[in-house]
């Protein structure tokens, strides 16, 4: 009976909300899987990092530490995306509660903010575009302007070299790979920047060819897996 009614009159607000919640839960599970695989790849990279330390292979240690730093930043973005999805889910349920009281759903600024943030994320863009159109038809969301669909800028491109060097240094220090740099060195920041430019060549040219325990193929495999998780 419910299906027949939906065919002639369209889905009820409650049916619409169940569909929206299902979409949100699906995306949250996708993010959970990405986080799981990202952690597994990062753990493997950390093991390889310690093995490189035993070989005193500073160049490749820095390359791998840079990949771990990127994985950490990507993991943070995934966590923030899941939190936004959770916020959107709560806001939509609040709309259903308001519907019972006032008999209608109203456009929400908070929902607009959450959808705007989520739609700019590459991994959620297509799903959130489709969801935003449904929310607009239901009157929960005002029509979004074109600039709201622009993708978020990649922090990998915006990151300053010195900041990236600092992250790499923190990772190496965390795993007791090399000692933290001396704060008394007046030219420490400049030296680190110059060192990193030399220590982080492309993987195709920068992997040590004479490594006995970890060869070029292993390091390329690690980086490929980390890059795949970020796509």
Swiss-Prot record:
Biased composition (Basic and acidic residues): 184-195
A GO biological-process term: protein transport to vacuole involved in ubiquitin-dependent protein catabolic process via the multivesicular body sorting pathway
Database matches in Pfam families: Snf7
Membrane topology: Peripheral membrane protein
Main location, first listed in the record: membrane
Compartments it resides in: Endosome membrane; Endomembrane system
InterPro entries: Snf7_fam
PANTHER family: CHARGED MULTIVESICULAR BODY PROTEIN
Protein name: Vacuolar protein sorting-associated protein 24
Gene coding for it: vps24
